[in-house]
Amino acid sequence: MRTLILDDEEPIVHMLAKVCEKEGHTVFPFTQSVDALIHLASTPIDLLITDMHMPEHDGMTVVREARRLQPNIFTLIITGHTSRYPIEDLMADGTADIMFKPFHMNELRTRLALAHRRRGLIDRLHQEKKALHAVSHEMIQGLEQELREATQGKQ
């Protein structure tokens, strides 16, 4: 999975990146939200892990923009508190998951597994839609051919 990590604290970014890499993720680490958003605009990302409170843009601003740029991105917000944003508001604005500080690395691994499973389901859905489209296209062509033959037979 391609994972973008955004936190204004370098040690946290490093720790998250280390765990994600051990889980097989390709990691894009950032400490500046502007740089992260520029990267999101040009590179497909499967998972966005972002802190809620940062100096330039808060996590919700980043999540909203990420979902605008990449609607299927899975987002995980890490926060120490929710007083500014109730959980319901976070979820309504596109956050897929929330993890509260302090957290254990096993909790992070569980969240990464959930994101990976979701990515797999989305990929499978796209494959099934493509296959369904191909089958329906063939059926329509067959029906159109039958209609042409029936029309020609009546003339």
Question: PLM ranges: what are they?
Answer:
Residues 24-31, 36-39:
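Short hydrophobic/Thr-rich beta-strand motif most characteristic of the beta2 strand and flanking loop
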Residues 31-32, 58-61:
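Acidic catalytic/metal-coordinating carboxylates
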Residues 43-49:
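Active-site beta3 strand of CheY-like receiver
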Residues 61, 82-97:
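Alpha4 helix (beta4-alpha4-beta5 surface) of REC/receiver domains from two-component response regulators
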Residues 85, 103-116:
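C-terminal output helix
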Residues 9-28:
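Two-component/phosphorelay signaling modules centered on CheY-like receiver
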Residues 54:
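Receiver (REC) domain active-site loop signature in two-component systems and cognate sites
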